[in-house]
């Protein structure tokens, strides 16, 4: 299932970006994930890199390490490098700095594709997201199948819409169950 999702994500990225490819030359793609410490982003990036290599395109990958200022600077760098498309998994979906940098990129004619999270008050050219609320529900259901009771500690990443949705799905599923605190 994850592999099929990755194939779909890469397909959407290339379908949207291929409309921008110069008649001659390579497409330039800037990619910034919120972190590369997550296996999902490592796997996604490996697949995008594989396809970019096959097509002879240039892939610029940056890791903001959960720092919105750094991600904003990376977007500005991509704009200066005249990439055709920016693929972003935003550190913070409502960050004024990130949104301002994306607006400058869009004004420069760069297409923006959001992956696995949304941006508030900004319209992207394409978005590929999973149902994060449902993912939270599934995690809670699996926990309840494996454990009859549990004391739960949730770590949050405030401002990340996808993480907030997963947590909400989890909480909504277990809230009526007194065995899970």
Residue ranges and their predicted role:
Residues 46-61, 175-180:
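Signal peptide-proximal N-terminal region
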Residues 30-46, 60-71, 77, 92-93, ...:
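Extracytoplasmic "Venus flytrap"
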Residues 17-31:
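Ser/Thr/Pro/Gly-rich low-complexity linker/stalk segments immediately outside membranes or between
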Residues 2-14:
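Hydrophobic membrane-insertion alpha-helices, especially the h-region
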């Amino acid at each position: 299932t994850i592999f099929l999702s990755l194939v779909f994500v890469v397909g959407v990225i290339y379908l949207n970006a291929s409309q921008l490819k110069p008649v001659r030359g390579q497409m330039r793609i800037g990619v910034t994930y919120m972190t590369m410490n997550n296996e999902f982003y490592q796997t996604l990036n490996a697949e995008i890199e594989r396809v970019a290599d096959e097509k002879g395109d240039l892939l610029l990958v940056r890791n903001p390490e959960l720092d919105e200022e750094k991600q904003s600077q990376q977007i500005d760098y991509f704009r200066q490098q005249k990439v055709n498309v920016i693929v972003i998994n935003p550190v913070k979906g409502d960050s004024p700095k990130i949104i301002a940098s994306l607006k400058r990129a869009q004004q420069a004619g760069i297409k923006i594709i959001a992956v696995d999270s949304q941006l508030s008050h900004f319209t992207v050219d394409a978005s590929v997201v999973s149902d994060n609320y449902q993912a939270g529900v599934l995690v809670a259901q699996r926990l309840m199948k494996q454990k009859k009771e549990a004391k739960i500690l949730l770590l949050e990443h405030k401002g990340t819409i996808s993480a907030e949705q997963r947590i909400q799905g989890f909480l909504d599923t277990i809230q009526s169950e007194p065995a899970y605190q």
